[in-house]
């Protein structure tokens, strides 16, 4: 059975996912500060916009003005898509306070009320016809109330998947923490992608690993990655080998690299996806 997929078009990411993200999945982007989680989420949205997939960005930790500026930093012009009604920012940061915030169309007044957030998000998705959603950072919603984490994630997931969207939830973890955002969160999402920034012999190494992804095969090794002027690039045909306190970047076995490359080619040959059936009411 062929699994419908959403291509990220992030260099190297579709390869390590053997073709892309299964449609309607909610994927946790987990990692410490400075690892590139927010960049990856925005790159996923912008790559979709360029190819006709409308998108919604939920800002929980940044002012909408700062969000737009961070897109522009990489040359990602979202202004035209906002004007055309194909992209929207849900302001769950300001609570509607301030003159700049008052110009926003989608505002969550009670930023810790997940039901209000769900209602505003639902409206933004319907208005734009969004296929892609990014929430940055979902950790903000339950940081002081870990007991409600799973319920929060499931509430948002029902709205997003029910409206036919595929989503990235950015999740903050402390430096050196091995988890991904808590057991309630980790089991509720469909996929987990971990981004890391580690020091070896005085040098920082960026890496990415797919920890889980339902309905698809995925790479089982840690891949090196870089943040360049145009966004994130993953060295999908290489992996990081750690021995003691040293690190080496090695090429993947040829058969593994070939299988990843072929999987992406096969997805590219598939016919354009049909209109997604909306189930959520």
From Swiss-Prot:
Domain of life: Archaea
Keywords: ATP-binding, Nucleotide-binding
Domain KaiC: residue ranges: 4-248
Entry-linked Pfam families: ATPase
UniProt keyword ATP-binding present: yes
GO terms for MF: ATP binding
Binding-site positions, ATP: 31-38
UniProt similarity note: Belongs to the UPF0273 family.
Annotated protein name in UniProt: UPF0273 protein PAE3143
Organism: Pyrobaculum aerophilum (strain ATCC 51768 / DSM 7523 / JCM 9630 / CIP 104966 / NBRC 100827 / IM2)
């Amino acid at each position: 059975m062929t699994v419908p997929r959403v291509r990220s078009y992030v260099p190297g990411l579709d390869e390590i996912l053997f073709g892309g993200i299964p449609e309607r999945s909610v994927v946790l982007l987990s990692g410490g500060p400075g690892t590139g989680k927010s960049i990856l989420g925005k790159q996923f949205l912008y790559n979709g916009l360029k190819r006709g997939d409308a998108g919604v960005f939920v800002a929980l930790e940044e002012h909408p003005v700062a969000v737009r500026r961070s897109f522009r930093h990489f040359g990602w012009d979202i202004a035209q898509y906002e004007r055309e009604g194909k992209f929207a920012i849900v302001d769950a940061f300001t609570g509607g306070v301030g003159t700049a915030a008052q110009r926003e169309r989608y505002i969550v007044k009670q930023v810790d009320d997940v039901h209000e957030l769900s209602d505003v998000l639902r409206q933004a998705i319907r208005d734009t016809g969004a296929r892609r959603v990014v929430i940055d950072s979902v950790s903000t919603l339950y940081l002081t109330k870990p007991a409600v984490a799973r319920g929060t994630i499931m509430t948002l997931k029902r709205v997003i998947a029910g409206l036919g969207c595929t989503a990235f939830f950015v999740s903050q973890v402390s430096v050196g923490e091995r988890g991904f955002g808590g057991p309630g969160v980790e089991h509720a999402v469909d996929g987990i992608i971990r981004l890391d920034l580690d020091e070896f012999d005085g040098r920082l190494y960026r890496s990415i690993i797919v920890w889980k992804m339902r309905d698809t095969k995925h790479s089982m090794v840690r891949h090196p990655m870089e943040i360049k002027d145009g966004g994130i690039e993953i060295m999908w045909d290489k992996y990081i080998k750690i021995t003691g306190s040293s690190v080496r970047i090695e090429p993947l076995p040829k058969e593994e690299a070939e299988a990843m490359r072929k999987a992406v080619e096969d997805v590219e040959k598939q016919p354009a996806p049909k209109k997604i059936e909306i189930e959520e009411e």
